[in-house]
Amino acid sequence: MGFFKLKEHNTNITTEFRAGLTTFITMIYIVPLNALILSHANMPYEALLSATAIITILSSVFNGLWANTPIAMSVGLGLSAYFSFGLVQGLKLPWQSALGIVALSGAIFVILSFTKFRSWVMRSIPSDLRRAVSAGIGAFIAFIGLKEMHIVVTHKATLVTLGDFSDPHVLLGVVGIVLTFALYTLKIKGSFIIAVLITSILAWVLKLAPYPSEFFSMPASISPIAFQLDFKGIFFDASGAFTLALVPVIITFFVTDLFDSLGTLAGIGHKTDFFNDEEKNKELERTLEADAVASLGSAVVGVSTTTAFIESASGVEEGGRTGLTAVFTGLFFVLTLFCLPLLKAIPSNAIYPVLVIVGVLMFSVLEGVNFKDMATSVSTFLTVVMMPLTFSIADGLAFGFLSYGIIKLVQKDFKAINSGIIILCIISVSVFIFR
C-alpha cells in the first residue's frame, strides 16, 4: 500500500482497518439522525437515509485518497438543523432553493480553499470567537433535540417550559439522554449507536413505536432529492424581483462550515498531536480542500453541507494514521445502505438524545475562552445565547462578531480589529439589513 505510505506513518493495513471500523461505529448514528433532521424540510426520509450514507461514503473515501488523512466526513448536524428549521421552516424557502444555497456556499468554499484564504482566516479570527461559534451551534442543536422530544415545549407566557413528563414518549427521550450520557461517560466505543439501539428496543417492547417488519432491503433511490437544486428562488422573490436578501445566509453556511472544519481538525490535532509538523500541516490543507469539494457535492446528492467529523479522533486514537482509515470508514458505510428498514424503524425520541450530547460536546470548547477580556466575554455570550434564542446560526454569528468589533473599538484596541474582523462585521451588518 505504497500509495498511503503506511511504513512512513508507522502503521499497517490491519491497524488502519481497525481504526476505520472504530470511526464507523462512533459515527454511524449520523445516518438516521441527519435524515430525521432534514425530513423536517419536507424531504422524503427514505431518500435522505440513502443520500446521507452516500455522501458519507464519497466524502470520506475522497478525503482518504486526496489528503491521505484518517479524517471521515459526513453531513454537519448544525447546518442540517439550520437548513430545516431556519431556512425551510423559518424563511419558508423551498428545500430545493435551500439546496441551491448549500451549493453556492460550497462553491465559494472550493474557490477559496485553493488560495491562502484559509490560513488568513486562521490568523485573523481570534480562537475564542471560533470556540464561541462551535459552542453556539452546540447550544442550538441541543435545544432542537430537547424541543423535538417535547422535553421543552412552547408556552404563551414564558415562551418555553417543561413538557408533559407523564407522556411515555417524553420519558423515553429522557431515558435516552441519561443512557447516552452514561455510556459516553464510561468511554464505551460506539456509545451513541448502542444507546440508540437500546432505547429503540425499549420503545418497541413498550409499543411506543412499531417494530421493524424487516431489517434489510435494497437501497432507496435518491432521485427525489438528487440534482434538485434551485438557484432562481435564491435571487428572485415570489414576484420575480431581484433580491440579495439571502446572500447573508449563503455566507453563513460558508463561514460556519469553515469554522466547523477548522475547529474539528484543530480538535483532532489537540487530542492526538496529529498535525504538529510541516508535512502533516500540508495534509491538513488538503483535508480542507477535500471538505470543500464534498460540501459542493452534498448539495448535488440532496443533503446539507458536509464537514470533517470529530469522531475521527477515535480512529486516530486506535492507531489510524493515513487516508486508508478514512477509506475503510467510507466503505463500512456501504452497509448502512442495505439496513434502511431498520434505520426507518428507529423512533425519533431514541435518536434525538444523541443530538443533545453532541451539543454538549460542542459546548465544552468554551473551557479555553478568555472570559477576563470584556470583548471576548460579551461576544462569546451573545453568540452562544442568540443562536438558540433566535433559532438562527446567522443571527448568533452576527451578534457575536459585531459585539466583538464594537467593544474592541471602544477599548481602542485597534490591533485586534484586523481586516478579517472588519469584513465579518460588515457581513454581520448585512445579516440585519437584508432581513
Name the predicted role of every residue range.
Residues 59-71, 182-187, 252-260, 291-301, ...:
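Transmembrane alpha-helix interface/packing and boundary motifs in multi-pass membrane proteins
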Residues 50, 100-103, 251, 289, ...:
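Internal alpha-helical transmembrane segments of multi-pass membrane proteins, especially GPCRs
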Residues 91-205, 209, 327-435:
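Membrane-embedded alpha-helical modules
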Residues 17, 37, 121, 190, ...:
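Residue-level signature of catalytic and energy-coupling elements of molecular machines
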Residues 70, 200, 204, 319:
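Conserved, well-structured core segments that form the ligand-binding/active-site neighborhood
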Residues 2-34, 55, 75-85, 89-137, ...:
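Helix-loop-helix junctions within the multi-pass membrane cores of secondary transporters/permeases
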Residues 1-47, 161-162, 194-285, 428-430:
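Helix-loop-helix hairpins and the membrane-proximal interhelical loops
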Residues 42-61:
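Loop-to-helix transition at the N-terminal end of transmembrane alpha-helices
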